[in-house]
């Protein structure tokens, strides 16, 4: 009903798989994330960024795997699904080796595509060969639309990708070919577009459809032909407005339909409160954020969501025992399928019904 104070999120029971709950670790590649239950981990920014290509292949065909080995083995041994982000061009391989982006002057050229794309092929194949059977999922690049409209980045900004739609599409195609030649069961997650909004025609939606339709350089395919899963980042607007989340997911689904990839799962590979961040929230406030976010995401069909980050000083909650306990309780609630329906009020509060009554958060 127009102007209704209540928006139905789901009229059916809400249930998720164990893989729905995911996490990042920032500082310790060997951190098993004790105290919280989860099934999916993402490797972006592991050990303060040591999972980026530039720190793994430090010069042409010279490799350092210490931190990545620790991360992979720790979480594989814990029985978790691993999502590894292929990203971060070394200066020596960069198409624009003096370019400065999100990681500052100490990491020149990182945001550019490789000058010689066969170096990218070799990197992807090397990772897939070393971790075959352990890493199942590969995400290609990180937030390519940050200060980039698909033609070029805005100079002087903290962009993560400085290439074009076509270059990004080629990167995805070549990663798919290199990885699946080694491990045909591996899955490719699309570059995760960020800055979604709950309105039509916004920049994230336009970027997503543009990149999915971009030619890959082989004369016949576009990016959508080379991805298996859609990745997005569902950071909320100022005030961590969970009231906007359902509308954001609706726009993701509209963009997927326009791109011809509606049948693919959607993974929120990175999200957290940022305006303000977790360190500025009380336990009660962070608890409300997590409950509203997770239940809404589950109700709207997000297959996995990965909190950023467990042990970050401003975004994490490693030392907050109450939040860890609430995370685990929320996980059990969603795994049980006991939420029979869910709605949201205009002010962002969540209402969900179980067999024992109604809860407002």
Which ranges hold each PLM region?
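N-terminal substrate-binding region of glycoside hydrolase catalytic domains
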Residues: 2-132, 137-140, 144-161
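Aromatic- and carboxylate-lined catalytic core of secreted/periplasmic carbohydrate-active enzymes
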Residues: 4-9, 291-361
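Structural recognition of the beta-strand scaffold that forms the well-ordered cores
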Residues: 19-25, 38-48, 81-86, 136-140, ...
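Short, solvent-exposed loop/turn segments at secondary-structure junctions
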Residues: 28, 48, 89-91, 145, ...
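Mature extracellular/periplasmic domains of secretome proteins
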Residues: 29-35, 216-218, 296-297
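Anion (oxyanion) recognition and catalysis
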Residues: 76, 180, 298
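A structural signal for short coil/turn segments at secondary-structure junctions
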Residues: 79, 131, 135, 183, ...
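Active-site cleft segment of glycoside hydrolase catalytic domains centered on the general acid/base Glu
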Residues: 98-227, 233-254, 276-293, 316-318
């Amino acid at each position: 009903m127009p102007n209704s104070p209540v928006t139905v999120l789901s009229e059916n029971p809400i249930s998720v798989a164990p893989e729905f709950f995911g996490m990042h670790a920032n500082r310790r590649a060997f951190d098993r994330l004790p105290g919280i239950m989860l099934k999916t981990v993402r490797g972006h920014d592991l050990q303060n960024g040591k999972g980026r290509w530039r720190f793994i292949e430090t010069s042409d065909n010279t490799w350092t795997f210490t931190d990545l080995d620790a991360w992979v083995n720790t979480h594989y041994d814990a029985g978790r699904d691993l999502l590894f982000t292929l990203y971060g061009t070394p200066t020596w391989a960069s198409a624009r080796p003096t370019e400065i982006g999100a990681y500052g002057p100490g990491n020149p050229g990182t945001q550019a595509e490789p000058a010689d794309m066969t170096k990218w092929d070799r990197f992807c194949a090397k990772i897939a060969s070393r971790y075959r059977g352990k890493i199942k999922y590969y995400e290609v690049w990180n937030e390519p639309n940050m200060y980039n409209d698909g033609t070029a980045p805005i100079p002087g900004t903290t962009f993560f990708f400085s290439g074009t739609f076509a270059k990004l599409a080629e990167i995805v195609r070549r990663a798919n070919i290199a990885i699946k030649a080694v491990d045909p069961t591996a899955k490719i997650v699309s570059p995760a577009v960020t800055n979604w909004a709950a309105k039509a025609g916004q920049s994230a939606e336009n970027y997503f459809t543009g990149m999915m339709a971009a030619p890959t350089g082989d004369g016949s395919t576009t990016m959508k032909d080379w991805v298996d899963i859609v990745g997005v980042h569902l950071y909320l607007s100022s005030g961590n407005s969970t009231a906007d989340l359902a509308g954001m997911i609706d726009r993701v689904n509209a963009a997927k339909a326009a791109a011809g990839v509606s049948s693919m799962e959607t993974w929120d590979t990175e999200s957290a409160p940022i305006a303000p961040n977790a360190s500025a929230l009380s336990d009660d406030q962070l608890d409300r954020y997590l409950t509203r976010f997770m239940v809404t995401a589950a109700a709207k069909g997000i297959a996995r969501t990965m909190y950023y980050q467990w042990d970050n000083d401003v975004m994490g909650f490693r030392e907050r025992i109450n939040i860890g306990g609430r995370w685990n309780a929320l996980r059990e609630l969603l795994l049980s399928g006991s939420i029979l329906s869910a709605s949201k009020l205009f002010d962002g509060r969540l209402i969900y019904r179980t067999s024992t009554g109604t809860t407002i958060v």
